[in-house]
């Protein structure tokens, strides 16, 4: 009986210690995300629009915690998350931070002179995020080749190989809901980064812990320095010509192009212009696009 009592006492003490440790972790966690929230509210680094968004959730503890309890993870596929203010959201600051990590990796690889190609899709803030990535690269001495409007991911892959870039960035969240956006990294072979590069880049991104160490510059200064260059029609033409080389039976297209009717639904996506262009250049005269999905 005495032995059972001692055993029960030991179990109780262990339970209390676990609860105390858990409570301490919760307090530390709460302090951490609240400290981050206050930092974003008070530090001059963050713009007024971001601060106003955060002020609106001042009474919503759960929302504050969800936005700040961790950093938005940079995984093997890059970034992906809900758009909004906070360390666990897609915004210009988390995009800059991720880009600084990628820039650090590129510099260590000696690839600054090759530059980086950047494309983006039709999601909310995609052009802005692409610009922020480009200006961070430029501030690190890495030239950014930025598409002048949205382009499909395969064309980004083509562009970075055509231009001889060391890396490429696509701002997209693929199939995720509209409140999401993302950021994918490609390497000089035109494919998404794979092991061991993906983990090496992740390590560089995770080492960027202070927003004030992230470099950026104005677009005017970047363009004047030759570190920001728009790309577009010249890449489109080269891409279309390469696509035409992949046609298996061009003679069949010539036979049916005048009469074949095609309905195309772009779903508001990046394929809208290039698909219609290649079909037109191949001679298809009856291509109908669903207006509500342009």
Regions found by a protein language model. Give the residues of each.
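Short polybasic linear motifs
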Residues: 13-16, 20-21
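An N-terminal, well-structured beta->alpha segment
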Residues: 32-133, 225-259, 270
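Ferredoxin-reductase
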Residues: 39-43, 111-188
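Gly/Ser/Thr-enriched, mixed-charge loops and adjacent short helices
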Residues: 63-68, 72, 181-294
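Short, small-residue-rich loop/turn micro-motifs
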Residues: 76, 120-122, 173, 291-294
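Secondary-structure transition/capping motifs at alpha-helix termini
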Residues: 107-111, 136-145, 163-167, 211, ...
